Amino acid sequence: MTVTGAYGVRLSGLPVDTWLGVSGAPHWPELSCEMDSRSDAPELALDMDTRKLRVRDDIAHSEFVHPLLGRVASQVALARGADAMHAGAVAGSAGAWAVIGPKGAGKSTLLASLNDIGVPIVTDDVLVFRDGAVMAGPRCIDLRPDAPRRGLGIAVRPSDPRSRIALPPIAAEHDLAGVIHLEWSSGETAMQPLDHRDAIRRLLILRSDKGYPRDPQALLDLATLPTLLLKRPRSLKQMDAAVAQVERLLCESGGRAAARR
């Protein structure tokens, strides 16, 4: 059954549920959303004791879904003993692969291109994880105006113009199989394994920049997973090669799309 939720929480009380649809999440805690009409209210106010989320009623649903919900999700994750990080993820039958890159690394553009060929996208921007499982994010990808892409999304977030691509509903949780780091290159597209030391170094840089993952042990656990570096030129013409590398990885690790059981 598909329910309204993302990032490890079910959401009730929202006037609309666009871009929020996952299956197999009855065990996720529920946040009760209430609209707040006060002009001086914060955009979002989370009370974990009562599991209530107050949303200022002039906040557009598109803004709530992204980026605001991701910020709340990180707080909820920590309160539940989970963790989070700035990353996307794609699904294969052997599990999900986290996709990590600094701002401007083309993460969302790559995920949108993978979605075009039917690769299931677990999340675009925030990855919540716990006990070896990752939680599905909102069912959309936001692309900046300067992002090279095929096809058109819909315009959202007037304060920060982007185009939004809708994603289909997906299973709520997936085993975490490995990590892909993104990097631009002046040469050919290539994917190479990273050793444990380099995996830790890159995760520490991410933590220093974004503040997550918070738990040092969670970071070390991530670094023990198979870790790869995908290097590719800043060219839409080379996107097919990058997509092919990720698709090959998913096939070699057992094919696409299976949920955690």
Per-segment meaning from a language model:
Residues 1-60, 244-261:
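Long, basic/Gly/Ser/Thr-rich N-terminal segments
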Residues 3-8, 14-17, 88, 92-101, ...:
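Glycine-rich, often acidic-flanked micro-motifs
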Residues 19-33, 58-67, 73-75, 96-97, ...:
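Short linear motifs at secondary-structure transitions and domain/linker junctions
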Residues 36-93:
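Extreme N-terminal, non-catalytic leader segments
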Residues 104:
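Walker A (P-loop) phosphate-binding loop of P-loop NTPases
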Residues 107:
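Conserved lysine of the Walker
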Residues 110-111:
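Post-Walker A alpha-helix
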